[in-house]
Amino acid sequence: MPKPPDYSELSDSLTLAVGTGRFSGPLHRAWRMMNFRQRMGWIGVGLYLLASAAAFYYVFEINETYNRLALEHIQQHPEEPLEGTTWTHSLKTRLLSLPFWFWTVVFLIPYLQMFLFLYSCTRADPKTVGYCIIPICLAVICNRHQAFVKASNQISRLQLIDT
């Protein structure tokens, strides 16, 4: 059981008002048991989720504008391309014709990869950081498969000695 702080030795009133800065409880014990990388990982996860909430709000506001622009684009009759049309206008019309789910998938994959990387930083074992990123995951799986094949080949070459 933690000992209550002795306020008789505190000299200034601010320290007396705030206390010693030591908190007790399971959350504080868990926080103290983590190393620096894990703490920064959890702070990163929290900030990432907070920024994600703000970004999702912004995206859904843009979704209404995107739908309106896409509908305007579809409702227009296809006209012959004007010679004064710039490549940026042409690119904009082609990108607007892509469905919203396509843009969702394009942005969701890197989003999940970043989230899973930050989450992997919260693990106690530093060797497991980054295993959830797709290229690293594929490399680990291929390496394990090659190691398994190599080990099974070595085992098959061993001669059993019957005594």
Swiss-Prot record:
Name of the protein in question: Lysosomal enzyme trafficking factor
CC annotations in GO: Golgi apparatus; Golgi membrane
Compartments where located: Golgi apparatus membrane
Matching InterPro entries: LYSET (IPR028024)
KW Metal-binding (keyword) present: no
Annotated transmembrane regions: 40-60, 98-118
A single GO BP: regulation of vesicle-mediated transport
Naturally occurring in which organism (per UniProt): Bos taurus
Annotated function: Required for mannose-6-phosphate-dependent trafficking of lysosomal enzymes. LYSET bridges GlcNAc-1-phosphate transferase (GNPTAB), to the membrane-bound transcription factor site-1 protease (MBTPS1), thus allowing proteolytic activation of the GNPTAB. GNPTAB is involved in the regulation of M6P-dependent Golgi-to-lysosome trafficking of lysosomal enzymes. LYSET is thus an essential factor for maturation and delivery of lysosomal hydrolases.
Family: Belongs to the LYSET family.
Assembly description: Interacts with GNPTAB; this interaction is important for proper localization of GNPTAB in Golgi stacks. Interacts with MBTPS1.
Highest taxon listed in the record's lineage: Eukaryota
Keywords associated with the record: Golgi apparatus, Membrane, Transmembrane, Transmembrane helix
Membrane topology: Multi-pass membrane protein
Pfam families: TMEM251 (PF15190)
